[in-house]
Amino acid sequence: MVIMIGKWIPLERVLRFPEVTPEQVTAALQQCVDQVRNNLPAFEAKFPAANSEHNFYTPGPNTDWTPGFWTGEVWLAYENAKNDSDRFLFRKAGDCQVDSFLKRINIKHYVDHHDMGFLYIPSCVAAYKLTGSVSAREAALKAANQLITRYRPIGE
C-alpha cells in the first residue's frame, strides 16, 4: 500500500529529502513574492513570451497559450503578500491582466484550442476566488463556454 501526502505525492518520495523548516519555507515564499514584484515593471500590463531569447522573456501581448501562468503567479503573490503596499501592486497588475483576458475571450483571439485552462484558471478563476471580480468571473465563464464547444461525443 502506498501512503500519499495529498493526492499526488507518495510519502516515500518526501522522505528522501531533508526536512525543511517553516522558516526556510517562509523565506522561499517571500523570495518568490519579491521576484514577482521585481518583474512587475516589465509585465504589469504585458506577458512573458512563451519561450526565452538568450534567457530573457520579452514582454508582449496576451496572444499565446502561456500568459495565464504569469497572471497566476501575480495572484499567488497577491495572496501571500505581507503588506498592503504589495497587495495593492499585485491587485492592480492582476486586475489589468484580467481585463486583457476578458478582451481576448470577447474578441475570440486564439481561443479555439485545448489550452484554455492554462489561460483562464490561474488568471481569471483565481482572481474571482480571491477578489470576487465580476470581470474575472465573466471571462472565466466565457472561456469555459468556448472550451465546451470543442467537445465531440464520438471524437474526431
Language model regions located:
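Glycan-recognition and catalytic cores of secretory/periplasmic carbohydrate-active enzymes
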Residues: 1-156
